[in-house]
């Protein structure tokens, strides 16, 4: 008589395997770094898709895509997350994008190499990124149009002379990390249909070496890409009008400003479907200030959904208990700006900045999405969450979901989060949920995303 438990039968064991577990039985990797990326990030990607109720075929497809196409581009697995947190970016981010219609999963990564590939020839990674998006575009199941990417790259990438100037040891070694990152790649993993790509250009280095403000670089690039078609110019116009009044300056590593443009992004689709995004950071954390940017000084007041979205931003502002005031990036940067000593710093700051002052790493990110033929750019806000314990962040996300009427997502969020970080005490960690973003459209309602940085912890 067979006395073995039924669950030990091979067919039952096979049926219990998740897509990640099944693929793990078959995959091999070229080195320990690739294997570590798979062991640490693969389960998180698999879980986020299961929790979002992706069908089984999509789970297998996207996990295999991650293993075979993305992991080889990530470079060495960080020996310690601390160094990458300090540099302001880590090679891989997984985000969950929540809407009434369902949850989708997205990846974002900075292409790297195992030995600092040709660093003297490509110190800022522009050539590598061009290679990467072209290679990914050849994968079946990926929909990509590279025409606009190539146009933007020809305008926004550093020239050879600019690279050589910035790569001089006296300059390059003193650049902060955000000035050394040129591109990142975003990957949308839809519940149905094809994978799509997004490319981001960080323009601080270009602005520094060219002495052209990032606003001007961004606006001119969009106008050039538009080529008289009037696809993106209508949506750009209110953005340009609003920020031209601020007299934006070129980027400077030693003189960070309250409002700074950072990046421009492009969804790699044909021009009639592509979307462009302009990103800025804001260190004056006041709701009135956010409301002014959100509406572009009232220019968007008649935009459908803009006021409803702003009211939900107000609710989220309260849920997160934002400390209102001027948040300086670092005390040392403030000292550099003043050229003074710590004893005289407080008095000098009080004169120039009447708001309450904080010396921390807090800031907001906002972007405006410009769509072909649409005169209304769509605002989105990102809250940096590193000052809160991860369980407190989870409480805030649950409160937001309940406020939006997403009862099922609210009931599952904390349990799901704990599954992504099985070896972490979320009462003692912070920054695993790095950002929380929010936008609103009259057509689709609220859209909020959580960005995970501590992958596989």
UniProtKB/Swiss-Prot annotation:
GO biological process annotation, one example: alkaloid metabolic process
Protein's pathway: Secondary metabolite biosynthesis
Superkingdom, taxonomy of origin: Eukaryota
Effect of gene knockout: Impairs the production of usterphenyllins and uscandidusins and leads to the accumulation of 3,15-dihydroxyterphenyllin.
Binding site for dimethylallyl diphosphate: 106, 198, 277, 279, 382, 447, 451
Coiled-coil intervals, chain numbering: none
Keywords: Prenyltransferase, Transferase
InterPro entries: Aro_prenylTrfase_DMATS, DMATS-type_fun
One example GO MF annotation: prenyltransferase activity
EC number(s) per entry: 2.5.1.-
Function: Nonribosomal peptide synthetase that mediates the biosynthesis of usterphenyllins and uscandidusins, p-terphenyl derivatives. The pathway begin with the biosynthesis of 4-hydroxyphenylpyruvate (HPPA) from L-tyrosine, possibly by the aminotransferase ucdG. The nonribosomal peptide synthetase ucdA then condenses two HPPA units to produce atromentin.
Family note: Belongs to the tryptophan dimethylallyltransferase family.
PANTHER family in UniProt: INDOLE PRENYLTRANSFERASE TDIB-RELATED, PRENYLTRANSFERASE ASQH2-RELATED
Name this polypeptide is given: Prenyltransferase ucdE
Organism, as annotated: Aspergillus ustus
Phylogenetic classification of the source organism: Eukaryota, Fungi, Dikarya, Ascomycota, Pezizomycotina
């Amino acid at each position: 008589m067979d006395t073995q438990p039924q669950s030990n039968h091979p067919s039952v064991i096979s049926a219990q395997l998740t897509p990640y577990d099944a693929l793990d039985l078959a995959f091999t990797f070229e080195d320990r770094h690739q294997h570590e990326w798979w062991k640490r990030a693969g389960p998180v990607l698999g879980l986020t898709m299961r929790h979002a109720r992706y069908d089984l075929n999509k789970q297998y497809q996207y996990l295999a895509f991650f293993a075979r196409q993305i992991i080889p581009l990530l470079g060495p697995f960080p020996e310690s997350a601390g160094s990458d947190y300090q540099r302001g970016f880590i090679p891989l981010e997984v985000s969950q994008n929540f809407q009434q219609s369902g949850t989708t999963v997205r990846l974002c990564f900075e292409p790297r190499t195992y030995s600092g590939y040709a660093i003297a020839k490509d110190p800022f990674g522009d050539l590598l990124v061009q290679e990467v998006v072209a290679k990914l575009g050849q994968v079946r199941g990926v929909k990509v149009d590279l025409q606009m990417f190539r146009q933007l790259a020809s305008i926004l990438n550093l020239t050879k002379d600019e690279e050589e100037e910035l790569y001089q040891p006296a300059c390059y070694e003193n650049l902060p990390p955000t000035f050394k990152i040129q591109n990142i790649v975003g990957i949308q993993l839809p519940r149905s249909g094809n994978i799509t790509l997004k490319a981001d250009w960080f323009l601080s280095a270009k602005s520094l070496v060219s002495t052209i403000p990032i606003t001007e670089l961004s606006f001119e690039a969009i106008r050039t890409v538009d080529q008289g078609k009037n696809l993106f110019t209508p949506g750009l116009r209110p953005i340009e009008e609003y920020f031209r009044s601020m007299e934006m300056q070129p980027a400077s590593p030693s003189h960070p400003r309250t409002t700074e443009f950072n990046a421009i992004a492009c969804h790699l689709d044909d021009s009639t479907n592509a979307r462009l995004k302009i990103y800025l950071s804001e260190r004056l954390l006041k709701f009135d200030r956010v409301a002014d940017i959100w509406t572009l000084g009232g220019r968007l007041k008649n935009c459908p959904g803009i006021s409803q979205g702003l009211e939900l931003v107000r609710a989220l502002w309260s849920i997160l208990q934002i400390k209102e005031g001027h948040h300086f990036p670092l005390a040392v940067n403030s000292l550099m700006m003043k050229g003074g000593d710590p004893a005289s710093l407080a008095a000098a700051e009080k004169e120039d900045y009447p708001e309450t002052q904080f010396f921390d790493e807090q800031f907001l990110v906002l972007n405006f999405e410009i769509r072909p033929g649409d005169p209304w750019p769509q605002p989105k806000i990102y809250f940096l969450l590193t000052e809160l314990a991860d369980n407190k962040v989870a409480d805030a996300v649950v409160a937001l979901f309940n406020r939006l009427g997403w009862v099922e997502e609210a009931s599952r969020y904390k349990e799901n989060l704990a599954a992504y970080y099985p070896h972490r005490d979320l009462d003692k960690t912070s920054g695993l949920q790095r950002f929380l973003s929010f936008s609103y459209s009259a057509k689709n309602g609220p859209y909020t995303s959580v960005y995970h940085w501590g992958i596989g912890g």
